[in-house]
Every structure is written in structure tokens, then in C-alpha cells.
Regions:
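Short N-terminal micro-motifs specific to bacterial/archaeal maturation
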Residues: 16, 31-32, 103
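Cleaved targeting-peptide boundary
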Residues: 23-35
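A general structural-boundary detector
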Residues: 12, 27-28, 99
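Positively charged n-region of N-terminal signal peptides that target proteins for export
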Residues: 1-6
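Structural signature of transmembrane alpha-helix termini at the membrane-water interface
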Residues: 18-21, 52
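A cross-family detector of function-defining hotspots
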Residues: 36-167
Length: 167
């Protein structure tokens, strides 16, 4: 998990330095990575089920998790990570990423492409297929290849190295 957090922090920092806000980030439920603050998340979602503070690449970060009754409809768990390096410096109160763990059947490949269009890239992580959107959305599918396992929203980013682009 720590490696994923570092990788995400690195990608977000690289995207902000290279692309300094040229594309809008994908948002979900009023939460937009790179724009929304802790105070706004709390006003939208209320008090989280649990929180955790951690250090990522020397920065103090925080994670808020909304589960069960506190999670949005159709979602098992909503995880919001705070702490983002921006062109003007580190912002500990800014949303770095937003991760949705949907309930089975809530999303599938068809609903993803209907809602977000064709992905900028597709790939495989072990046995798991994923879609990448340059606006900052990563969609990982269940091992059956159809249902959605997780959706992670980040600020806009370049495709991961080696990600094939759709034809």
C-alpha cells in the first residue's frame, strides 16, 4: 500500500509540474482531486468512518475512509487521500486521490465507457485489466474482466509508462 501511495504521489506531482492544470480532473460526488479541500469533503460527506495519518515521501498525509452506511449508495468503501505537491508547494489539506470500491454489479465496462468514453490507455496489472483516462481516472476491473473492482480519481496525468493506447 505504501508503494502505491508513493507511486500515486509521484504521478500527481509529475503531472502538475509537466501539465500545470491544462486539463480538468475527473470529479466524483463533488470531490475533485487537486482542487477539493478537507473542509469541503467533510461538508459533503460528513465525518469519516476512520482516518489514518501517514508519511509519504517525507510528507504528512491523511486518509479518510467512508464505509458501510457512511459510503455513498452503490459503493462499499470511499477512500479520500489528502496531501498534494502543487506547483506552489505542498498542500496537506488538498485531495490527492479518491478511490471507490463499488458494490458488485454497480459498475461494469459498459457503464464506464458510457459514462467516461473511450480510455486513453488500457493495460493489465497481473491478471487484472485496467483503463486509464488522461483526466486522472484509473479503473481496475474484477478478475472476471467485466465488473469494476476499483475506480481511482487523481489530478490529470500522463499515461503510465508502457501503457498501450487504444486503436
Amino acid at each position: 500500500m505504501r508503494t502505491l501511495a508513493r507511486f500515486t504521489l509521484f504521478l500527481v506531482a509529475a503531472a502538475l509540474v509537466l501539465d500545470a492544470g491544462a486539463a480538468a480532473a475527473e470529479q466524483w460526488g463533488g470531490i475533485e482531486p487537486g482542487e477539493t479541500t478537507m473542509a469541503v469533503v467533510k461538508s459533503l460527506r460528513g465525518t469519516p468512518t476512520r482516518t489514518a495519518k501517514q508519511k509519504v515521501d517525507g510528507y504528512d498525509t491523511e486518509e479518510w475512509v467512508y464505509e458501510d452506511a457512511k459510503a455513498p449508495a452503490g459503493i462499499r468503501r470511499l477512500t479520500v487521500d489528502f496531501g498534494l505537491v502543487t506547483p506552489s508547494g505542498y498542500r496537506p489539506d488538498l485531495v490527492r486521490s479518491l478511490k471507490l470500491d463499488p458494490k458488485p454489479g454497480a459498475f461494469d465496462k459498459e457503464s464506464i465507457t458510457t459514462g467516461w468514453g473511450a480510455p486513453a490507455g488500457v493495460g493489465k496489472d497481473g491478471e487484472v485489466d485496467f483503463f486509464f483516462y488522461k483526466e486522472g481516472l484509473f479503473v481496475y476491473f474484477a478478475k472476471d474482466g467485466h465488473g469494476v473492482a476499483t475506480m481511482t480519481f487523481t489530478p490529470p496525468q500522463p499515461p503510465p509508462p508502457g501503457t498501450p493506447l487504444p486503436r
